[in-house]
Amino acid sequence: MIQQESQLKVADNTGAKKVKCFKVLGGSRRRYATVGDVIVCSVRDIEPDSSVKKGDVVKAVIVRTRNDIHRKDGSTLRFDTNSCVIIDDKGNPKGTRIFGPVAREIRDRGFVKISSLAPEVI
């Protein structure tokens, strides 16, 4: 579960390394976000020559969480890190590559471009 003040790793090649969530989109009092949810976050740590700058406010979709993901068939899924992919206003990823596996729920939520760029969909 991702909430306000949560720090996440960035799983794409935009140049941002870490972001900090400050709003979960999808309701006036929504507290937690999980895989496939969109959050508004601030860039906290960057690589040199990146397309985003430190302090930029960006939208991101969560692709991995340390909290369990419960599926309808009874199986559960858990990742090692909390990670996200930075997106634009239309929902397309800003980067051209995605690092690491992503959950299948990403495709179910309508982020087909992210799931097709990912090396593995679990």
UniProtKB/Swiss-Prot annotation:
Part of the 50S ribosomal subunit. Forms a cluster with proteins L3 and L19. In the 70S ribosome, L14 and L19 interact and together make contacts with the 16S rRNA in bridges B5 and B8. Keywords: Ribonucleoprotein, Ribosomal protein, RNA-binding, rRNA-binding. PANTHER family: 50S/60S RIBOSOMAL PROTEIN L14/L23, LARGE RIBOSOMAL SUBUNIT PROTEIN UL14M. Pfam families: Ribosomal_L14. Belongs to the universal ribosomal protein uL14 family. It comes from the Bacteria. The gene is rplN. NCBIfam families: rplN_bact (TIGR01067). GO terms for cellular component: cytosolic large ribosomal subunit. InterPro entries: Ribosomal_uL14 (IPR000218), Ribosomal_uL14_bac-type (IPR005745), Ribosomal_uL14_CS (IPR019972), Ribosomal_uL14_sf (IPR036853). This is Large ribosomal subunit protein uL14. Binds to 23S rRNA. Forms part of two intersubunit bridges in the 70S ribosome. One of its GO terms (biological process) is translation. Disulfide bonds: none annotated. GO terms for molecular function: large ribosomal subunit rRNA binding; structural constituent of ribosome.
